[in-house]
C-alpha cells in the first residue's frame, strides 16, 4: 500500500515532467521519456536512472501507480509496465501549476513596472 503523499510543492523538475507526461495518458518508461522530451521541445532529457528512481519515490508517495491498461497487444511488448497518474498525483500537479502561475504573475508584474 502506498504511503501518504510526502512530495509537497515545489516538485523536482523530474517529478513535474513525469506527472505532465502521464497527465495525457498511461505510458511505459520509454514512452514517458519520449513524452518528456516532446513536452519540453527537447530541452529536458531524462535518462533511465532519473526516471525510474523518481518513479519509485512517486509510487511510494502515491502520485503514480502501475496500470492494468495495455496498448494493442499486436503493437506492444508484454514485458512493458505501464504507469498512470493517481488522484493524488493529479492534485500535486495542479498545486504545482498553481504555484508556478503565482510566481509568473509576480515576475510579470515586476517586469511590467521596471522593478
Please tell me what each predicted stretch does:
Residues 88-115:
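Amphipathic alpha-helical dimerization/coiled-coil segments
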Residues 74-96:
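Basic, amphipathic "hinge/linker" alpha-helix immediately C-terminal to the N-terminal HTH DNA-binding motif
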Residues 51-58:
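Basic amphipathic alpha-helical segments that dock to polyanions
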Residues 6-50:
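N-terminal helix-turn-helix DNA-binding core of bacterial DNA-binding proteins
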Residues 61-76, 84:
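Beta-hairpin "wing" of winged helix-turn-helix
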